[in-house]
Amino acid sequence: MEGRSVEVVPVSQLLTRSFYIPAYQRGYRWTQDQVEDLLNDIHDFFPREVPGSEDKTWYCLQPLVVRPVDSSEIVIKDMTSNKIEYELIDGQQRATTIYLIGHYINEMFRGKIKESELSLRYETRFSSTDFLKNLSVGTDENVAIDSSNIDFYHISKAYQTIHSWVTRLNAEGRFKQDRF
């Protein structure tokens, strides 16, 4: 176990990092319930003062297991930039959902000033990287479900779930953008 360590980092720090998703990882398969559970957990969490300290409590996701890598260790077709910093060993479903939430918030609320988004690169599902970057809510306020391949289908369904969840909470006057 020499050389291994556990580091707790805020999600905001993850947004500046690049992740490589190796071939052994299954495709994205989170369901509507799983996406909504994560959204509700984040939204309902409220930081509280820690007694005797200036610190506040913080929301803790289930872990992402990563391994630092050198870009020369990884061969990804058509990769011309984006230095890869970490191999994502476990937590790809969570990382992808965090990406989708951040991408949605950027698209719908941030305007011209975009916050950083996770960089996800796939060893074997090359088109998934571009698909993630190009997700959007249409002018008709709907998310098109792409069933051209199974990964696109589940990713677009998750994005649709995020859009429906935010739209519903907005209509009820309960959406708190600052929680994201």
Predicted regions and their residues:
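Glycine- and hydrophobic-rich flexible loops that cap the catalytic core of alpha/beta enzyme folds
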Residues: 1-180
